[in-house]
Design a protein with these regions (language model features):
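Hydrophobic faces of well-ordered beta-strands that scaffold small-molecule active sites
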Residues: 7-13, 62-64, 87-91, 134-136, ...
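Active-site gating loops and adjacent loop-to-helix segments of metal-dependent hydrolytic enzymes
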Residues: 17-43, 91, 95-108, 208-219
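Metal-associated gating/positioning segment near the N- to mid-region
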Residues: 3-78, 182-183
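Active-site gating/metal-coordination segments in enzymes
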Residues: 101-158
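Active-site core of metal-dependent hydrolases
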Residues: 97, 137-219
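Mid-domain alpha/beta scaffold segments of enzyme catalytic cores
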Residues: 64-108, 113-118
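Short, acidic/polar
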Residues: 43-53, 110-127, 171-178
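Short, well-ordered coil/turn segments that N-cap beta-strands
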Residues: 59-61, 82-87, 130-132, 161-165, ...
Length: 219
């Protein structure tokens, strides 16, 4: 006989990416042959390509954890469409690092708060425009130490709680992941890569109730 099982939930997707180099010129730059602007225009015009891929894989709900502003509209567009999964989308990322090549002339998928007050303002703006979560792209650089970024992340987390949105964080080092959890992150969207996680980190996650999304990659 036949039976139905609950659909899978993919907690880390990006409708603003393609799954290939044309959507991430910061990883491999193929823009000379495959223009980034065209790839992004195609994504916006034809999200049904991804809808089909998800549904055919048994995925009936997805969490878009950061992208161009138009991704926020997918939730309403897909809610009653049987040809699409349920979508929750964070919208633009609050970023501590500027990748430059991942932006378009007329829109950006990043906001760059310089301090805690700007982070709070960005959170309020995201809430007003319908974001389902606040995504912080927490990346240390030689120009910006983790210590200098802590006030921004903490302010974003505090303001997210105030407006009733979950805080989700890209933090791939143990040090940044600990800061993210301390700021109230409900989801870490990547595994820690530089060290084995320690008891302190695990205890903090359990206390906070943080979900750990490994975001495994098949190579």
């Amino acid at each position: 006989g036949c039976y139905l099982t609950p659909g899978l939930i993919d907690t880390h997707v990006h409708y603003s990416q393609t799954g290939w180099a044309d959507g991430r010129p910061d990883a491999r730059d193929v823009r000379a042959e495959f223009p980034y602007a065209q790839a992004m225009a195609d994504n916006q015009a034809h999200p049904e390509r991804f809808h089909r891929a998800f549904l055919h894989s048994g995925v009936t709900a997805v969490f878009d954890v950061g992208g161009y502003p138009w991704t926020r509209g997918l939730a309403a567009a897909c809610e009653h469409d049987l040809r699409a999964p349920y979508v929750a989308a964070a919208g633009a990322l609050l970023a501590t690092y500027d990748p430059k090549v991942l932006m378009l002339p007329d829109q950006s998928q990043f906001v760059f708060p310089k301090d805690g007050e700007e982070a709070r303002a960005a959170v309020r703006s995201h809430r007003a425009f319908g974001s389902a979560a606040i995504k912080v792209w927490l990346i240390e650089t030689p120009e910006r130490s983790l210590a200098s970024l802590v006030p921004i992340v903490m302010a974003a987390g505090d303001e997210a709680r105030r407006v009733g949105l979950p805080l989700i964080v890209h933090s791939t080092t143990l040090a940044t992941a600990k800061v993210a959890v301390a700021a109230g992150a409900q989801v870490l969207v990547h595994s820690v890569e530089d060290h084995e996680v320690d008891d302190e980190f695990v205890a903090a996650m359990v206390k906070q109730g943080t979900f750990y999304c490994p975001t495994l990659t098949v190579r």
